[in-house]
Amino acid sequence: MPQNSPIEKLTTAVFGFALAVGALSLTAANPETTADVVGGLVLFSLSFLILVVIWWGTSDIMSKIDHGRPVTIFLNIVLLFFVAIEPYLLNILNTSAELFPLSSTLYAIDMAFLMGLSAALCHILIKENKATLTAQQLRHFTIGRTNQFVCAGLFFLSTVPQFLEWTLAGMSVRVLIWFATLAFSLTISAKNRNK
């Protein structure tokens, strides 16, 4: 992506906004118990890590892709929409136990779309640049794309109603799937960067 291109500026602004609003949402939570404080910090940490990982990956992809193509612009704008609504959903997760079933489902769908769209952009990068990428770069982006698609699938899987009802150590299995997905993604990404 050319330095300071309009899409780069928009991407940086939207991701920065989402991270800032997510942090501010913690102040609106009005926790009443230690569990509320810990729960809010845990959910914010998950959100923060996912957004940073997607921002980092999207920046890497967009620096190597023809971002002037209509499909690339469309996918990037849709991705930014899902980034922009993430803090709103996170805020509802942190402030309303009554809305947790709905807000956690919407949050999982939002995360699935974020990861799926990132994977789609990576797929376009691979397709457009297969002839010019080194074998190592091709492997790196292929693993990254597959990792993102798998994570998108895991977030969609977490919307199954039983995962909301079941708990483990007092935490919803849905949220545990989110953390397992993040751990899986970070592990694969770290191994992929070290090769």
Q: Language-model segments: which ranges?
A:
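Multi-pass alpha-helical transmembrane bundle typical of ion/small-solute transporters
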Residues: 1-195
